Amino acid sequence: MDFTKSGIPGFSVTDSFADVKQRLDIVRAGNDFGFESVMGYLPLDGKRYLMGATQNPMTYDIDSVELRELFKGDTFEGIALGEMSAQEFAGELAKIGSVPIMEDTGIWWPAERVCFYVYEDVPSTICWWGKDPIVDEVKTIFSGKIGELDLNVYHLYKAEE
């Protein structure tokens, strides 16, 4: 499956939370942190992907959509997932969009409002963010104000020499 900047085929962060919730084979729904969230399986292209969505408690729009448990052969904008290190993957993203912001646990692609969570130095989860994120740190990342972040944790992608 080739995932894109705009989201999961058939889903968008501009969809209503209720519509997204209806399309999942729900494993867990909750109101953990004062906002609603749901996690469930989404059948796509003959596979069952684990997908989560959180709701913005102020606007009731989708805050984020997350896709876990990627499969061999999955790609993002044509870039192979699971076959390269986080640094190499960030380099490929930089070729087709904004310069990623790196941290130990993730790759943030600010202009595209996408992040990739990293497990054992390999991108393993894709997360698309809505227009009004609720977490201040995420707001800062997507505003492009990296100087306001802890520079011991975050840094702009730079090609290895």
List PLM regions with ranges:
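Non-cytosolic coordination micro-motifs
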Residues: 1-44, 62-161
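Conserved short beta-strand elements that form part of the metal-binding/catalytic scaffold
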Residues: 37-43, 47-57
